[in-house]
Amino acid sequence: MNPRRKKRLTLAVALIGGVAAITSLLLYALNSNLNLFYTPSEIVHGKTDTGVKPEIGQRIRVGGMVTVGSMVRDPKSLHVQFAVHDSLGGEVLVTYDDLLPDLFREGQGIVAQGVLGADGKLEATEVLAKHDENYMPPEVAEAMGQKHEKLDYSQQKAPDTK
């Protein structure tokens, strides 16, 4: 092999290796920043089609309804713990250390984003509440079987302020 071809071959191999290394690093970075959506049943039992469960320490989003009577607040801090369930009977505990959205309440749909702990609790970094009576994130509506109930505020009387 003459020196010119050897130089071209070395350059081509180095270029292909560099592109492969950059692609690998890019895919690794994207994978670590990926937030997958799970329902409480999928966290407990795994995805229905693949059986895959989220790993401990994985960043995920979980959506469902806040279980009535499950909310526990720490009176000395902003720490709150509540359970999220879906129509299939799965339930996941969520802990959150910040102010909850104004529209957050028990029995309503939410999406919580955070890290799954070793004890199966989601340590949430963000909690999103349903923002009006018609909206529900598509993933949550599908997971809940669209069984959420719209609250009717028009029939409630305002308290007498006199």
UniProtKB/Swiss-Prot annotation:
Which portions of the chain have biased composition (kind: Polar residues)?
A: 153-162
What GO molecular-function term can you cite, just one? heme binding
Q: Which residues bind heme?
A: H131, Y135
**Where does the UniProt annotation locate this protein?**
Cell inner membrane
Keywords in alphabetical order: Cell inner membrane, Cell membrane, Cytochrome c-type biogenesis, Heme, Iron, Membrane, Metal-binding, Signal-anchor, Transmembrane, Transmembrane helix
Listed PANTHER family: CYTOCHROME C-TYPE BIOGENESIS PROTEIN CCME HOMOLOG, MITOCHONDRIAL
Can you name this protein? Answer: Cytochrome c-type biogenesis protein CcmE
Instruction: Report the source organism.
Output: Shewanella baltica (strain OS185)
Gene name per UniProt? ccmE
